[in-house]
Swiss-Prot record:
NCBIfam families xref list: PRK10888.1
A single GO molecular function term of this UniProt record: protein homodimerization activity
Reactions performed catalytically: 5 isopentenyl diphosphate + (2E,6E)-farnesyl diphosphate = all-trans-octaprenyl diphosphate + 5 diphosphate
Entry-linked PROSITE patterns: POLYPRENYL_SYNTHASE_1, POLYPRENYL_SYNTHASE_2
Name this polypeptide is given: Octaprenyl diphosphate synthase
Similarity section: Belongs to the FPP/GGPP synthase family.
Pfam families, alphabetized: polyprenyl_synt (PF00348)
Binding annotation for Mg(2+) 1: D84, D88
Sites where the protein binds isopentenyl diphosphate: K45, R48, H77, R94
Source organism of this protein record: Escherichia coli (strain K12)
Cofactor(s), names only, from the UniProt record: Mg(2+)
Positions annotated to bind an all-trans-polyprenyl diphosphate: R93, K170, T171, Q208
Amino acid sequence: MNLEKINELTAQDMAGVNAAILEQLNSDVQLINQLGYYIVSGGGKRIRPMIAVLAARAVGYEGNAHVTIAALIEFIHTATLLHDDVVDESDMRRGKATANAAFGNAASVLVGDFIYTRAFQMMTSLGSLKVLEVMSEAVNVIAEGEVLQLMNVNDPDITEENYMRVIYSKTARLFEAAAQCSGILAGCTPEEEKGLQDYGRYLGTAFQLIDDLLDYNADGEQLGKNVGDDLNEGKPTLPLLHAMHHGTPEQAQMIRTAIEQGNGRHLLEPVLEAMNACGSLEWTRQRAEEEADKAIAALQVLPDTPWREALIGLAHIAVQRDR
């Protein structure tokens, strides 16, 4: 199923999600309204709330509470973006100035805190202790992942295992929670819950692998941020590690130095040459496709419905995208 058909299938539910997001962002504090609206209207993909919507429908849910789960998932994602951009000193996201560039670091951090706490208010409104447990654990793991990534900055010696732990924690865990919590809310079977959980984990991993790849081979304007940001920030992502381990000794030393020192955007062209020579970008894409295939396989426990087909379609879209 292509994105157009997925959007048609989820149009009513996603309209409810967007309305819930705007309603729950409302505050008596004007700056929260201004910055909150600035970030949520920034043209994000909404893939995480869409997973939540589709997962609930795929196991036969007919109520409306999945809209709340979808909205709070987007809130958690939004709060992490606000904090990430401060940590990374980013100035562009989704083709426009980041919130910290537009409003300042302090406002971004504090509004991020507000959005986190509002997400937990929404969780408690669902009346499901298990959903609260899963989401609380997910947010904790996400925070750990961000700290792990911070520890890995400027470290060219991190292992692939360490890298995969980081992307599971900071990205895939929220995908996993989105699918799992919707299944829990819908009263799905344990087998279906496990299938949804695995789907989210594998899809989130594939999604982040493609994100890391696009940092090196996308068009900056289309990507909506600066190409080579990871290199400039000294982040050792999988494409960079592959090129360092499979390139010439000279290329390996250049990449090692770029990671250690940061501020390496001027080395982007020779780094890309090394990646192309080693097939690093294609290798990373293949790894992402393997994860997407695992995500699709995990859905076999679900009934064969258009909702399941849409989840399968999302897995394909995640690895075929160019932004």
